[in-house]
Amino acid sequence: MTKLSKRVKVIQSKIDRNKFYSLDDALNLVKECATAKFDESIDVAVQLGIDAKKSDQVVRGAVVLPAGTGKYVRVAVFAQGEKAEQAKAAGAEIVGMEDLADQIKSGKIDFDVLIASPDTMKIVGTLGQVLGPRGLMPNPKVGTVTPDVATAVKNAKAGQVQFRVDKAGIVHASIGRRSFEPTALKSNLLALLEALNKAKPPASKGVYLKKVAVSSTMGAGVRVDQASLQAAA
C-alpha cells in the first residue's frame, strides 16, 4: 500500500470529497491546501451537459480573465507590412513570415501563443503537423486568426485563456495562482463560466453547466455548489 505523505494527509483531512462548498469557501480551501514550495496554479474543471462526440456540440473559445493568469506569455505573430508593425507595437516578441515558419519547422518554438493575420494562412497551413499536437495552431474560433493582430496580442498578454471541451465533456482551465487574492480567482472563474455559457451549442439540452470543481496543481478537487455560482454571477 502506498504511504501517503504528511502534506497529502493534511489535504485529505481538510477536504470533504462528498461535500459541495460555496464558491468563496471552495476558493479559500483550495488556497489553504496549496502548500507546495512553488506558486501553484489554481485550476477549474467544468462538466458540461453535452455530447462531445457530436460535432455540433463541440465547445471551444477564449476569454480574457479580468485578473490575468499570473503567467508571462510570449506571443509570436504571422504578419507582414503594417500589421507586422502593429503586432510589434502591441508587444509581440516574435513577428515574421517565411522566417518564422522555418523556425517552427526546425522545432524552435519559443512562444506560448501564435497569432496569424488571415492573409498569412497559406504559410501557417503548412505547419499543422508541428503546431496542432502542441495546441498552438491559430484558429478564428479562439481569436488567433484575425485581421486585428494588435488586439489579439494585447488580449494574449492581458491573460486570455483558450478552452476546449475534451472527449468526456469536461473543460479544464487555469484561473490564476495560489498568490492571487480569492476575489481575483472568483472574478476569473465567473468570467470563464460566462464565456462557456455564451459558447453553449444550440443542440445542448437540459442542464448545461453540470458540475464545477476547483483544485491546485498538487491539491485535491473541491466541488462547488451550483447555487453559490448562480448567486455570484
Swiss-Prot record:
One of its GO terms (cellular component) is cytosolic large ribosomal subunit. Gene3D superfamilies: 3.30.190.20, 3.40.50.790. Keywords: Repressor, Ribonucleoprotein, Ribosomal protein, RNA-binding, rRNA-binding, Translation regulation, tRNA-binding. InterPro entries: Ribosom_uL1_bac-type (IPR005878), Ribosomal_uL1 (IPR002143), Ribosomal_uL1-like (IPR023674), Ribosomal_uL1/biogenesis (IPR028364), Ribosomal_uL1_3-a/b-sand (IPR016095), Ribosomal_uL1_CS (IPR023673). GO terms for molecular function: rRNA binding; structural constituent of ribosome; tRNA binding. GO terms for biological process: regulation of translation; translation. The keyword NADP does not apply. SUPFAM superfamilies: Ribosomal protein L1 (SSF56808). Pfam families: Ribosomal_L1 (PF00687). Part of the 50S ribosomal subunit. NCBIfam families: rplA_bact. Binds directly to 23S rRNA. The L1 stalk is quite mobile in the ribosome, and is involved in E site tRNA release. Protein L1 is also a translational repressor protein, it controls the translation of the L11 operon by binding to its mRNA. Belongs to the universal ribosomal protein uL1 family. This is Large ribosomal subunit protein uL1. The lineage of its organism: Bacteria, Pseudomonadati, Pseudomonadota, Betaproteobacteria, Burkholderiales.
